[in-house]
């Protein structure tokens, strides 16, 4: 299960430095780690003088730059976070820089002062770090938010511990699900981070005996649809010649 944590904050607050230190620490613990940087003020990553740019101008939807030591994928549209996360199948953690508007992602606040902590404190914060640690006065002010304030350079082990304990997988954010007993995925995420709820409350992660993917995205199943699919498929497959005891079924349907 891939888990995600976002490092959020204002400009020059230390976001990238925090990501670097946490990534190294998680890697040293044997995890597969990926990262995504949000660039809301940048329209194009590719450059007009590059051949890859010219490929895109010809109208192709995806351009791949295959170099000796790295491969770059240019997709000619903005992707939602769940689409981006699909590229990280098999990874343990995805570290996001930015994405403060995500409503069900655990967050580390990078701040220069206590006022910035207040700005980004939305009930999803698991830690505060960044430039603020250089000022005892600002640290004292920010301590009122009851979120651990850690120096990423000398306390990265504690930050990584919090990531291990508090990072969440990507929630489905279904508007009318409420199967977990909370109003939204945002409310459930806050409750999990606060320690008053469990990830198993989410139908997507609480019942793993039936997993439905549509177009590469996992679809949460409530109890009765899950039970119906499970019993129907097992009943049909068990009747086929050559099938003995069924322990797992993989079915792929492609629309013609």
Q: Residue ranges of each PLM-predicted region?
A:
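Non-heme iron-sulfur electron-transfer modules
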Residues: 192-207
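Glycine-rich phosphate-binding loop used to anchor ATP phosphates in small-molecule kinases
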Residues: 71-115
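Immediate flanking context of iron-sulfur cluster ligation sites
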Residues: 164-176, 194
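N-terminal phosphate/diphosphate-binding loop that engages ATP/GTP or pyrophosphate donors
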Residues: 21-76
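Walker A (P-loop) phosphate-binding motif
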Residues: 1-41, 138, 172
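Local cysteine-cluster metal-coordination motifs and their immediate loop/turn environment
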Residues: 174-190, 203-204
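Conserved C-terminal guanine-recognition region of P-loop GTPase G domains, centered on the G4
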Residues: 98-138
């Amino acid at each position: 299960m891939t888990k995600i944590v976002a490092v959020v904050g204002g400009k020059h607050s230390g976001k990238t430095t925090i990501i670097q230190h946490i990534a190294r620490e998680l890697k040293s613990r044997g995890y597969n780690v990926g990262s995504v940087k949000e660039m809301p003020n940048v329209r194009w990553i590719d450059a007009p003088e590059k051949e890859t740019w010219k490929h895109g101008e010809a109208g192709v939807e995806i351009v791949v730059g295959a170099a000796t030591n790295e491969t770059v994928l240019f997709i000619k549209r903005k992707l939602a976070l769940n689409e981006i996360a699909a590229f990280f199948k098999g990874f343990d953690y995805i570290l996001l820089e930015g994405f403060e508007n995500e409503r069900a992602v655990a967050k580390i606040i990078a701040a220069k002062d206590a006022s910035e902590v207040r700005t980004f404190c939305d009930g999803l914060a698991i830690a505060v770090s960044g430039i603020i640690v250089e000022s005892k006065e600002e640290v004292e002010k920010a301590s009122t938010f009851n979120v651990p304030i850690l120096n990423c350079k000398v306390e990265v082990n504690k930050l990584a511990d919090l990531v291990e304990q508090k990072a969440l997988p990507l929630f489905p954010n279904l508007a009318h699900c409420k199967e977990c007993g909370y109003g939204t995925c945002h409310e459930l995420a806050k409750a999990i981070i606060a320690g008053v709820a469990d990830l198993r409350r989410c139908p997507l992660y609480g019942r793993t005996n039936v997993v439905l993917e549509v177009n590469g995205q996992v679809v949460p199943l409530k109890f009765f649809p899950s039970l119906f699919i499970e019993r129907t498929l097992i009943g049909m497959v068990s009747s086929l010649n050559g099938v003995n005891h069924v322990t797992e079924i993989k079915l792929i349907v492609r629309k013609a």
